[in-house]
């Protein structure tokens, strides 16, 4: 990836971006949100897990009220291409499976699993992936689907379908969007600052799935700490 970044810098020098006149350029107000490190959120007594957390059809529950479940255990299976599975965020007991009001959804309520947490946070053993290069891109795609990953944008498309369309169309350049134009949101910058190795590893896995020739991490110039962390990791691992 280091060689690809250097190659992309040479290309960028040859390209001249045209200014867009007008519009709004708000101040970056991220100082407060970046003062502390990434911390785990406290586990509440009840977790409400919608079965439709994505664009498409809802997942179908495979657990029953009263079942004791472990962290990462599959609770609802995706039954179509536009459906992703739902897993337990922590251990506990299934308290209810019922229609529940959900913010930001077109309908007033949707089917949800209510998980009463036990505070133990006991987890199942996850299937390790020591070297993603040992798997084909289709096998990696299946791992992404089984993990229940979907986009965090407004549409919430299943990540598997995004990647599948890229494979079918053919991709030369994979762009990892780490640019944050919103004045306060700082999740991308915080993630890169603290976990640059994981970001690069994830980019390499996506590149293997998409069969892309090159990969570029797009990040704004004012994200100095994040850029330095990426450079340090790439230079030390090359």
Protein language model annotation of sequence segments:
Residues 2-62, 114:
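N-terminal, Lys/Arg-enriched amphipathic/low-complexity engagement segments
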Residues 38-46, 63-70, 169, 174-179, ...:
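N-terminal glycine-rich anion-binding loops that anchor highly charged ligand groups
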Residues 59, 65, 82-85:
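Short, conserved secondary-structure segments in the cores of folded domains
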Residues 64-77, 96:
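Short, well-structured beta-strand-loop connectors
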Residues 82-238:
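Iron-sulfur-associated redox domains of electron-transfer enzymes in respiratory
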């Amino acid at each position: 990836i280091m060689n690809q970044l250097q190659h992309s810098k040479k290309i960028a020098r040859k390209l001249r971006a045209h200014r867009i006149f007008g519009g709004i350029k708000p101040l970056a107000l991220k100082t407060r949100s970046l003062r502390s490190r990434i911390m785990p959120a406290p586990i509440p007594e009840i977790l409400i897990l919608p079965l439709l957390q994505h664009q498409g059809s809802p997942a179908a529950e495979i657990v029953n009220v009263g079942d004791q479940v472990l962290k990462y255990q599959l609770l609802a299976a995706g039954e179509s291409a536009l459906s992703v599975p739902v897993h337990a965020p922590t251990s506990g007991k299934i308290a209810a499976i019922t229609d529940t009001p959900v913010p930001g959804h077109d309908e007033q309520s949707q089917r949800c699993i209510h998980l009463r947490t036990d505070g133990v946070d006991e987890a199942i053993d996850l299937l390790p992936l020591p070297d993603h290069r040992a798997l084909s891109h289709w096998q990696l795609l299946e791992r992404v689907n089984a993990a229940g990953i979907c986009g965090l944008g407004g549409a919430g498309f299943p990540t598997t379908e995004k990647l599948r369309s890229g494979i079918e169309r053919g991709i030369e350049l994979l762009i990892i969007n780490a640019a944050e134009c919103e004045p306060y949101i700082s999740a991308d910058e915080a993630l890169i600052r603290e976990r640059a190795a994981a970001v690069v590893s994830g980019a390499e896995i996506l590149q293997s799935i998409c069969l892309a020739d090159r990969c570029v991490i797009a990040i704004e110039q004012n994200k100095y700490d994040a850029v330095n962390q990426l450079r340090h990791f790439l230079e030390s691992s090359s």
